[in-house]
């Protein structure tokens, strides 16, 4: 197979996934934007977390809110729970990898904050544990998933499920949805 043909196939797959994602996530997206705006207006914060590529998305989206997305404005309170290697490794060593995010939510989360777990499968144990702790503490426990939503269904609300079984396509939609989230939160919570 020629490389260009392969690239064309990847772009076509992306376009197919893009075509069905909007309708699938529209309603929970609106609720998530509102939850984030309400939390920030009340002095709360948004906590992002995930593993691997989803950890990178968590960092990326938190940075967009703290620094800027489209324009210079006041900083918005957001944090990626994927960046503190001392905390992550101490927790994994002393407790378990399953608790690396939930311990941070226990320490940093407050009722009314928004916790956003990102996992393409919807079933990453440490993300699920963190969402359960967040929900029990009175945070909005939201999620980005793919496939059929996995074990996040019934736990995360709002839950934005990308209707694809291909990890790369799910990740591409997650960052698109995340950018749209940052755009709308920035526009409402910190208008120019």
Curated annotation (Swiss-Prot):
It is an enzyme of class 5 (isomerase). Residues 36-192 form the SIS domain. One of its GO terms (cellular component) is cytoplasm. One of its GO terms (molecular function) is zinc ion binding. Disulfide bonds: none annotated. Its cofactor is Zn(2+). It is found in: Cytoplasm. Pathway: Carbohydrate biosynthesis; D-glycero-D-manno-heptose 7-phosphate biosynthesis; D-glycero-alpha-D-manno-heptose 7-phosphate and D-glycero-beta-D-manno-heptose 7-phosphate from sedoheptulose 7-phosphate: step 1/1. Belongs to the SIS family. GmhA subfamily. The reaction produces a racemic mixture of D-glycero-alpha-D-manno-heptose 7-phosphate and D-glycero-beta-D-manno-heptose 7-phosphate. Catalyzes the isomerization of sedoheptulose 7-phosphate in D-glycero-D-manno-heptose 7-phosphate. This is Phosphoheptose isomerase. It comes from Paramagnetospirillum magneticum (strain ATCC 700264 / AMB-1) (Magnetospirillum magneticum). The lineage of its organism: Bacteria, Pseudomonadati, Pseudomonadota, Alphaproteobacteria, Rhodospirillales.
